[in-house]
Amino acid sequence: MAQTLSFNGRRRVRKFFGKIPEVAEMPNLIEVQKASYDQFLMVDEPKGGRPDEGLNAVFKSVFPITDFSGASMLEFVSYEFEAPKFDVEECRQRDLTYAAPLKVTLRLIVFDIDEDTGAKSIKDIKEQSVYMGDMPLMTNNGTFIVNGTERVIVSQMHRSPGVFFDHDKGKSHSSGKLLFAARVIPYRGSWLDIEFDAKDIVYARIDRRRKLPVTSLLMALGMDGEEILSTFYTKATYERSGDGWRIPFQPEALKNAKVITDMIDADTGEVVVEGGKKLTPRLIRQLVDKGLKALKATDEDLYGNYLAEDIVNYSTGEIYLEAGDEIDEKTLGLILQSGFDEIPVLNIDHVNVGAYIRNTLSADKNQNRQEALFDIYRVMRPGEPPTMDSAEAMFNSLFFDAERYDLSAVGRVKMNMRLDLDAEDTVRTLRKEDILAVVKMLVELRDGKGEIDDIDNLGNRRVRSVGELMENQYRLGLLRMERAIKERMSSIEIDTVMPQDLINAKPAAAAVREFFGSSQLSQFMDQVNPLSEITHKRRLSALGPGGLTRERAGFEVRDVHPTHYGRICPIETPEGPNIGLINSLATFARVNKYGFIESPYRKIIDGKVTTDVIYLSAMEEAKYYVAQANAELDGEGAFTEEFVVCRHSGEVMLAPRDNINLMDVSPKQLVSVAAALIPFLENDDANRALMGSNMQRQAVPLLRAEAPFVGTGMEPIVARDSGAAIAARRGGVVDQVDATRIVIRATEDLDAGKSGVDIYRLQKFQRSNQNTCVNQRPLVSVGDAISKGDIIADGPSTDLGDLALGRNALVAFMPWNGYNYEDSILMSERIVSDDVFTSIHIEEFEVMARDTKLGPEEITRDIPNVSEEALKNLDEAGIVYIGAEVQPGDILVGKITPKGESPMTPEEKLLRAIFGEKASDVRDTSMRMPPGTFGTIVEVRVFNRHGVEKDERAMAIEREEIERLAKDRDDEQAILDRNVYGRLIDMLRGHVSIAGPKGFKKGVELSNAVVSEYPRSQWWMFAVEDEKAQSELEALRGQYDESKSRLEQRFMDKVEKVQRGDEMPPGVMKMVKVFVAVKRKIQPGDKMAGRHGNKGVVSRIVPVEDMPFLEDGTHVDICLNPLGVPSRMNVGQILETHLAWACAGMGKKIGEMLEEYRKTMDISELRSELTEIYASEANDEVQRFDDDSLVKLAEEAKRGVSIATPVFDGAHEPDVAAMLKKAGLHESGQSVLYDGRTGEPFDRKVTVGYMYMIKLNHLVDDKIHARSIGPYSLVTQQPLGGKAQFGGQRFGEMEVWALEAYGAAYTLQEMLTVKSDDVAGRTKVYEAIVRGDDTFEAGIPESFNVLVKEMRSLGLSVELENSKIENQSEDQLPDAAE
């Protein structure tokens, strides 16, 4: 672990509690995505051409394309990518896809065909590079930008191609009999199932259609009945001897059989085994030793056996009996009559060998190949009459045609392993031997030999990553294109065309676009914080095209499997319907070239654990004994214990140390990134750990990030690999720093072609996909020396290069007036006033001005009927200023839309004619702030269509952008000049000059003073005697000029892009995007959580003075309910609280020492304290710190010492107690607390300490919602639902029951009519309220009319009778007294 600390590692050192040294480097966390897509695209062609994989393989599998007559052929030569038109940032801003144009070189060959002989000769060859659409590129962070939004392609887990043997677990048949089945799954093509039925007949099914006897399939492969039987059974021959038969003694077949009648030796006639005995292996061995060769058999023994060959009269050719026929008295008589004295029978004893194939053959109605082929044809294409040719072609195309059927290399490898075959992995179709081997293996399973497969074993499931998914998609696109090309080749004059005229790349481009835009696996990136990004990229989904569906997935697929160890995290998976179907890759896992997940292990050689690391997939691991990473070793690397806990083929066991071959690399290799961030994970219940790892992904980046006191050591890795924090690309010295960029002058890796300057642009207050704020802050200052990989800027949720999702808050576990009932959280006002949990959210609003039928819409400040007050935030172009504070209903962008002309009165016409054109009617369609949002405008972007005149605002934004680019160019130029002229003066110094600028004397020795007399631009005029030096000068000059022109060119390109108009959707003239930053303070109703699945909702914010306080007067920040811990068994949170309390205590001590040092300037005490705190082999760096670094470290540590307790290898209880003791605190971790309202101490001591709390992205502001009137559904006329639709509150069935129970008839009527869908009634109520009246009448709800209409549509005549009732006169009514 002792590595040299990076630039920020010197400011924050974590005390490391892990005891197990890590021998393997953790792979880059987004390698899964990047490696897969790079392998697919292969942008840079390697020397010797591209290998046959990825995009190259796709082209090669579809090309060459020949036309129907064979007169011409289109071949694929190679492909290349051009530079993308826009970079990542520009694509984000302009809503474009980040992609590179794909150019494919194709060769069209035209043949001359001799009409008589049919011989071909080449007539013409044309080569051309053809544009084949744009291929999306992956950004450095493993994402794609599609239409301006970041997306991630999730890897998919699916069943590996190959052959699988299984049984129905006795479910299909009432007797509970196990029905075995085999299934051959190709990568693409038809599935082949071979299965038993309840009567033990073997059937085959193709593509899950109607089943056929398996013997029909074998016949279609060209076998006859006798050949089938000889393949599956051995034969024994009964020879006639005297009045009985002799049969060869077969020891193997008789093992453990029971003898019914006496066994008699055919040669000697003696009884060797008496009837009723069991043939044990020992007894059989004795018989073999005695030399028993043959046994005596009677006619009865022959009955029930099956013939192995046809019994044929060779002279006449007459077949008496066929192979597979059963022998009984009648048939035996027939055989003996015909003079046969040898009878070959099948070795079937119905115990070790069953007669399944023989029974299937006799039950099969097809007798030969033609009938079998016809039968298969009828199953596959019902209703078409078969011919021999069509049936044969169809059968061949099913499994034996490489175009239609592909096992893939994986499938072939898996099949070879399972069936013990040795075909090359280039043989991608089925062979006859494969099908026979599958049937044989299935029959052996039925006979009780061998094991069925476990489909949930990770050896039988593989991962399809981006590259492979994309490859399949692109292949589909090319195949669609192929049909079109063939038709075009046949229909046009082939001699005159170029390859470009044949190709329409639309289908291929559409396939790519469709995949990225609407595939189930192409997902909108979860970008709440850096951890959620990383987790999303490492996700494995079993859903998606070609995968499972939620409804069909049973319990087994979702369950944790022993092979998940070190490959898939057993903890992190969603709660709910997707549980177990969506998983996360373990920290050290990687995906191999076949798509299986591999985990790393240390090799053990001669009983010593080495540092050699090998990666194994689940299949390979099964044969090894693997020790845990925490097994105790001595100094030599040998196990100290005689017996070691280890894993072998899915079982955990104790094994002697000499048997152990491998050892885990690290204790955290079994969990995923999110779970590895939970300290004391080993003390938490798994269900709560699952919630903890899921909730960390929802943590909102706070205004000020703060790294946890108690971490796990994973924090810097996540921050670095997610790309949130910026790492230096190469070593150098910081030249300039401001909030938006860092300029570093490189001091290493200085190639001639590269610029010597790295400019890092920081993202300032950008919006993430989830509306959280992405903001980067520089960590370096001018003059700092940086090495490659150092973190130079923090991103969202990172603090000094550590992931920082929340804040350390002082918590007390105690009830407080019922405000922490049911996991509620009580909070101090200090947290609100100090902005501890304040976050910034950025909302985007966009307005489009379209060209309508009545005329163009216009973005303007001139809006009808709007007061000047409402326009105060708008500039002259009608767009809001940056920095304006806006609230609900404020205008962001003024826009007017023409509305239809109203007919004019004659007077108006006259006035118009006199005074000229008055503006035609327009209505106000301005963009306004939605209800409930307050904020500040942070950015405005204006986009114009090509050729539309730009307004003032657009011009101003453009000028600003160009100034920024010019500044970049000038800074880079200045550093270049400084470097080059510095080198130039060094080269000239000490040389004698033979030429120079005007007025220079020859032959003078050059020095700094001499050269500096002239302006820099004239220094190039100096020439020196030494030829070598002179040529170096010229080389430097060339290099300098080239760099300068390259810089200028780059600047001009960017400026041209800025000034060019933008691509717009059809009909849009202009678009404005406004970004509003909203500051969200914590408030009651917000959801918060710790890292251990302990979540709760803020219930009340209490004044600081009312919160409980410690003896020194410190008030606690948060009160949590102690009852939330025992039942949930997440004790990790208590250990974390104690340990962080100790950290803060130590920090306080360090702070005091720092004060002392500032007074006395004696650093020795501070140095000894820090060295003692960080004393361990992992932190020996601290001893070598200079005074400045030490003070910086102390400054950082005085808030609280940072420590790392890795999962499964962290601090134990004694360590926590020792830390508390060292900090001068009570070892129980409990303190006396005083009531803030009375000042009295509480009755008992309370657990107080720091807990790392995170604010989750479930904020009450986003959820609270109110409506009086608003939009209504078109059909039912009821209010819409949900905040997004500005909907109403649902009043459902159970709520109706509640009002009925109370007898609240009028309230109920009001709910069901005027508050919902009584259209006339609700308008009247509104009018009445406006008038100040409070009477209303309910009418007929619209839903009643809908019901009537539905009944009518069912053919029922339904009339509403109430209009027909006549008013009865008073006297006709019956009197009550009667």
Swiss-Prot record:
Gene3D superfamilies: 2.40.50.100, 2.40.50.150, 3.90.1100.10, DNA-directed RNA polymerase, beta subunit, external 1 domain (2.30.150.10), DNA-directed RNA polymerase, subunit 2, domain 6 (2.40.270.10), RNA polymerase alpha subunit dimerisation domain (3.90.1800.10), RNA polymerase Rpb2, domain 2 (3.90.1110.10). It comes from the Bacteria. InterPro entries: DNA-dir_RNA_pol_bsu_ext_1_sf, DNA-dir_RNA_pol_bsu_external_1, DNA-dir_RNA_pol_su2, DNA-dir_RNAP_su2_dom, DNA-dir_RNAP_su2_hyb_sf, RNA_pol_bsu_bac, RNA_pol_bsu_CS, RNA_pol_bsu_protrusion. GO terms for cellular component: DNA-directed RNA polymerase complex. Its EC number is 2.7.7.6. It catalyses: RNA(n) + a ribonucleoside 5'-triphosphate = RNA(n+1) + diphosphate. It is an enzyme of class 2 (transferase). Pfam families: RNA_pol_Rpb2_1 (PF04563), RNA_pol_Rpb2_2 (PF04561), RNA_pol_Rpb2_3 (PF04565), RNA_pol_Rpb2_45 (PF10385), RNA_pol_Rpb2_6 (PF00562), RNA_pol_Rpb2_7 (PF04560). Disulfide bonds: none annotated. One of its GO terms (biological process) is DNA-templated transcription. Keywords: DNA-directed RNA polymerase, Nucleotidyltransferase, Transcription, Transferase. GO terms for molecular function: DNA binding; DNA-directed RNA polymerase activity; ribonucleoside binding. The RNAP catalytic core consists of 2 alpha, 1 beta, 1 beta' and 1 omega subunit. When a sigma factor is associated with the core the holoenzyme is formed, which can initiate transcription. DNA-dependent RNA polymerase catalyzes the transcription of DNA into RNA using the four ribonucleoside triphosphates as substrates. Belongs to the RNA polymerase beta chain family. This is DNA-directed RNA polymerase subunit beta. It comes from Agrobacterium fabrum (strain C58 / ATCC 33970) (Agrobacterium tumefaciens (strain C58)). The lineage of its organism: Bacteria, Pseudomonadati, Pseudomonadota, Alphaproteobacteria, Hyphomicrobiales.
